[in-house]
Amino acid sequence: MVVRDTVPTKDFSLPHSSEAPERARRIVEEQLAPLLSRVRGHDLVQLVSELVSNSVQFSPPLPDGTIGLHLQRSDEEVIVAVTDGGTHLVPDELAFDSHEHERFGLFLVDSFADGWGFSLDGVKGIWIEMELRDA
């Protein structure tokens, strides 16, 4: 995950339940989407919703029973990370295919985010980056 100490960050704990995607959408809509164009803001909200939905459906929670949502912004970009208690698979083990439903979220992330990656520092996490530009 790309982390810069000099930019504003916020961390949220989401329930490991069907409520989590909606809460994540509301948080991102309020905190980050206004910084992006309408289309890119909508894309970011949808990507985060997909990642949180996958976390609820396919991974166990963090030790405290939640899913982590980390928001970070700078003058150039916004970054969102979703963490859970899932297995620590490397990206090659999570290869995606646009026709494979269970990996479709990664296909969307790869298609719409400006950057993304995995965190393997004690908790499983995926981060996405969207540049603050109109295109």
Predicted feature descriptions by range:
Residues 1-11, 56-135:
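Conserved beta-strand-loop-beta-strand hairpin that lines the nucleotide-binding pocket
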Residues 11-21:
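STAS-typified acidic loop motif
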Residues 16, 32, 36-39, 59, ...:
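Short coil/turn residues that cap or connect secondary-structure elements
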Residues 25-49:
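Conserved short strand/loop->alpha-helix "switch" segment adjacent to the catalytic nucleotide/phosphoryl-transfer site
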